[in-house]
UniProtKB/Swiss-Prot annotation:
Cleavage is inhibited by ubiquitin in a dosage-dependent manner. Cleavage is blocked by ubiquitin aldehyde. It comes from Rattus norvegicus. One of its GO terms (biological process) is negative regulation of skeletal muscle tissue development. It catalyses: Thiol-dependent hydrolysis of ester, thioester, amide, peptide and isopeptide bonds formed by the C-terminal Gly of ubiquitin (a 76-residue protein attached to proteins as an intracellular targeting signal). Hydrolase that deubiquitinates polyubiquitinated target proteins such as MDM2, MDM4 and CCND1. Isoform 1 and isoform 2 possess both ubiquitin-specific peptidase and isopeptidase activities. Deubiquitinates MDM2 without reversing MDM2-mediated p53/TP53 ubiquitination and thus indirectly promotes p53/TP53 degradation and limits p53 activity. Has no deubiquitinase activity against p53/TP53. Prevents MDM2-mediated degradation of MDM4. Plays a role in the G1/S cell-cycle progression in normal and cancer cells. Residues 1-213, 416-516 are annotated as: Necessary for interaction with MDM4. Expressed in mesangial cells of the kidney. Isoform 1 and isoform 2 are expressed in elongated spermatids; the shorter form appearing earlier than the longer form (at protein level). Isoform 1 and isoform 2 are expressed in early round spermatids of the testis. Isoform 1 is expressed in muscle and heart. Isoform 2 is expressed in muscle, lung, heart, brain, liver and ovary. Residues 280-612 form the USP domain. Homooligomer. Found in trimeric complex with MDM2 and MDM4 and USP2. Interacts with CCND1; the interaction is direct and promotes its stabilization by antagonizing ubiquitin-dependent degradation. Interacts (via N-terminus and C-terminus) with MDM2. Interacts with MDM4. Interacts with PER1. Interacts with KCNQ1; counteracts the NEDD4L-specific down-regulation of I(Ks) and restores plasma membrane localization of KCNQ1. Isoform 4: Interacts with NHERF4 and CLTC. This is Ubiquitin carboxyl-terminal hydrolase 2. Pfam families: UCH (PF00443). It comes from the Eukaryota. One of its GO terms (molecular function) is identical protein binding. The gene is Usp2.
């Protein structure tokens, strides 16, 4: 595996410095390789390499997971770009710098799901907390080792009866009327075993029914290879297990027609309702806390929330040439349900999960995943479905080298919008300037790349505490490319020592900063727990701008947190309400108020900043 920096890969693996752009006079020409293809290459960089498939000749350790696996279990790391996602569009993914990661993955999380949770509820109908059964915290406390022994001793039987009750493997009988009871309510081990067997049997039946209804139609074929039955639960509790579920596991929507149910649009005024506070929790479907954390952060993104609540996305769905709009529709319905539910309600995102795993099959099943990867796939899918460009124009071989950098960046942005123009992009996409200067002749070449987020290395200076500005300065600092890293200068016509540097040409409305919590060890990947001190208000990034600007001040409104290790852990979210301005902790189905002084922790992984309103002119 090459140990060249990821930034170098973006420079040297494209044809900019070896073929047309840097080695010849056409550097900066807008072609797929100079403005688009290299962006795909930046996403192919293994900043968070996936765990390699286990084979008899592989000595790489297989990651632990605390939930059921699927056939895609080996594909756990940073995903490769799929042609069905990017299509003709080759936009940048996250912009990052740093050495390639050794074998490992991102910060996988999702083990903190309630015991016995399944994903068979196919609607966004919220469940009131008053009817949600008993939590572990309400029962007599037991040590984790005792719980682990009790849960690991459970056994289930594949045989069950539908008329006279369920007969477990040890002969203990339970009436079907107890179907709504959670295994947590069992009074004896026999009853616990029988209830668990009943749940698994019912889940297998419902999973098969759901699969046939979705994929069994004549002439249709499943878009996914396989899916693990959602009823499977960990045999031993994860070290990061958190009892966050407080709902009746098998509560069904009565009176609904057969087939996959879909949530109806909210019928009351979402903006005037006192209960519309966006404080509904999300059910953990089984290792899906990474998804819940990101969804809550996006739900509290003011302009994206309004885009869904006011149904503005409907006018953009007709512009796309693709007939696939289910992901945007389900995402909007989920946001609408969250904001029309009462506080402490719990919403099941099962239909949304069905759509995201159809768009990105790597999320099929119930493996722990990296939240930043999920965010990138989700934003890419939403953007594609509401892209205002019906037919993308062919790239023109127009040379922009003769233009000043400011005008060149403006023209590059215009060409980008000719192909990629959506409300999602309006909010999250910025523009990064990359410069490469030859130390011999002084020739400087520039290229402008769109970005959806910035992956920041964690600075070592000031350990054990660094500031977010330290990380930004490390991201934008000058790097010397020498030795084997030398690119070819088109003016010198030889490989020369060069200096590369990043700066922000265009700041997005929503700036997502990804803290790269990965160690530099070549033996194995471990998580960095360094505390990064980040501001909640007035994050001034003007010193990182390519040109003078007074509009680069941000305020924090959401944080996605990861606790645990790179092998497994749990995700939560801290979000500031766009309505009340108050902070809340979103831990799957649990939503609790918090103080702004509690937002900064060493578990912060993704920071969501919104551009502050420009000062009014007198």
């Amino acid at each position: 595996m090459s140990q060249l920096s990821s930034t170098l890969k973006r420079y040297t693996e494209s044809s900019r410095y070896t073929d047309a752009p840097y080695a010849k006079s056409g550097y900066g020409t807008y072609t797929p390789s100079s403005y688009g293809a290299n962006l795909a290459a930046s996403f192919l960089e293994k900043e968070k390499l996936g765990f390699k498939p286990v084979s008899p000749t592989s000595f790489l350790p297989r990651p632990r997971t605390y939930g059921p696996s699927s056939i895609l279990d080996c594909d756990r790391g940073r995903p490769l770009l799929r042609s069905d996602i990017t299509g003709g569009s080759k936009r940048s993914e996250s912009q990052t710098r740093g050495n390639e990661r050794p074998s490992g993955s991102g910060l996988n999380g999702g083990s903190g799901f309630p015991y016995g949770v399944t994903s068979n509820s196919l609607s966004y109908l919220p469940m009131n907390a008053r009817d949600q059964g008993v939590t572990l915290g309400q029962k007599k406390s037991n040590s984790q080792s005792d719980l682990a022994r009790d849960f690991s001793s459970l056994r289930t039987s594949d045989s069950y009866r539908t008329s006279d009750g369920y007969r477990a493997s040890d002969g203990f009988r339970i009436d079907p009327g107890n179907l709504g009871r959670s295994p947590m309510l069992a009074r004896t081990r026999k009853e616990l075993c029988a209830l668990q067997g009943l749940y698994q049997a019912a889940s297998r039946s419902e999973y098969l029914t759901d699969y046939l209804e979705n994929y069994g139609r004549k002439g249709s074929a499943p878009q996914v290879l396989t899916q693990a039955p959602p009823s499977r639960v960990p045999e031993v509790l994860s070290p990061t297990y958190r009892p966050s579920g407080r709902y009746t596991l098998w509560e069904k929507n009565k009176g609904q027609a057969s087939g996959p149910s879909r949530s109806t649009s909210p019928g009351r005024d979402t903006m005037n309702s006192k209960s519309a506070q966006g404080l509904a929790g999300l059910r953990n479907l089984g290792n899906t806390c990474f998804m819940n954390s990101i969804l809550q952060c996006l739900s509290n993104t003011r302009e994206l929330r309004d885009y869904c609540l006011q149904r503005l996305y409907m006018r953009d769905l007709g512009h796309t040439s693709s007939a696939h709009t289910a992901l945007m529709e389900e995402f909007a319905k989920l946001i609408q349900t969250i904001w029309t539910s009462s506080p402490n309600d719990v919403v099941s995102p099962s239909e949304f999960k069905t759509q995201i795993q159809r768009y990105a099959p790597r999320f099929v099943g119930y493996n722990q995943q990296d939240a930043q990867e999920f965010l990138r796939f989700l934003l890419d899918g939403l953007h594609n479905e509401v892209n205002r460009v019906a037919a993308r124009p062919k790239p023109s071989p127009e040379s922009l080298d003769h233009l000043p950098d400011e005008e060149k960046g403006r023209q590059m942005w215009r060409k980008y919008l000719e192909r990629e123009d959506s409300r999602i992009g309006d909010l999250f996409v910025g523009q990064l300037k990359s410069s490469l200067t030859c130390t011999d002749c002084g020739y400087c070449s520039t290229v402008f790349d769109p970005f959806w987020d910035l992956s920041l290395p964690i600075a070592k200076r000031g350990y054990p505490e660094v500031t977010l500005m330290d990380c930004m300065r490390l991201f934008t600092k000058e790097d010397v490319l020498d030795g084997d890293e030398k690119p070819t200068c088109c003016r010198c016509r030889a490989r020369k020592r060069c200096i590369k540097k990043f700066s922000v040409q265009r700041f997005p409305k929503i700036l997502v900063l990804h803290l790269k919590r990965f160690s530099e060890s070549r033996i194995r990947t471990s998580k960095l727990t360094t505390f990064v001190n980040f501001p909640l208000r007035d994050l001034d990034l003007r010193e990182f701008a390519s040109e003078n600007t007074n509009h680069a001040v941000y305020n924090l409104y959401a944080v996605s947190n990861h606790s645990g290790t790179t092998m497994g852990g749990h995700y939560t979210a801290y979000c500031r309400s766009p309505v009340t301005g108050e902070w809340h902790t979103f831990n799957d189905s649990s939503v609790t108020p918090m103080s702004s002084s509690q937002v900064r922790t060493s578990d912060a992984y993704l920071l969501f900043y919104e551009l502050a309103s420009p000062p009014s002119r007198m």
